[in-house]
Amino acid sequence: IHSVYFVGIKGVAMTSLALYFYSKGVRVSGSDVKDRFPTDEMLSKFHISVLEGFTPAHIDTLKNVDLLIYTGAHDGKNNPEVVRALSLGIPVLPHGKALGFCMEDSKQISVAGSHGKTTTSAMIATVLSHAGKFPSYAVGCGEIFPLGSPGACGTGELFVAEAD
């Protein structure tokens, strides 16, 4: 995979997965609403292009996109950009399946529950990183301050994910 487009990229889970791909050297771009999000600064920090709104024209202008990942928000699979990508034969995955795809060759640590998922996932990723385990991680937050990003592809065998 050389290029991934995210529909709803500003959501915390989507941003963390986008940054995972970015850290692998994959070209990342996406679209979302104009509203300010806690992830705006992180996307800007890594120079990830975010188009405003959702229109089939965004998909028509993409060059060599290998995969489109969409969120359940913004009409999910019925989003006009997702519909256009499908009509052009671009592979499309919802966020959860895309995260599973990224994790499938790793030893997986998924944090689930009703309270504390983000904090616990971030703590696990931080401890493993500082212990020299070089984990991959995708945590739904604006930033994991000790690590500098809510998502990254590490060189170790572990993948830490916040499970929704």
Q: Each PLM stretch: what is its role?
A:
Residues 1-98:
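N-terminal leader/targeting and accessory segments in enzymes
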Residues 20, 59-61, 76-164:
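Phosphate-binding loop of NTP-binding sites
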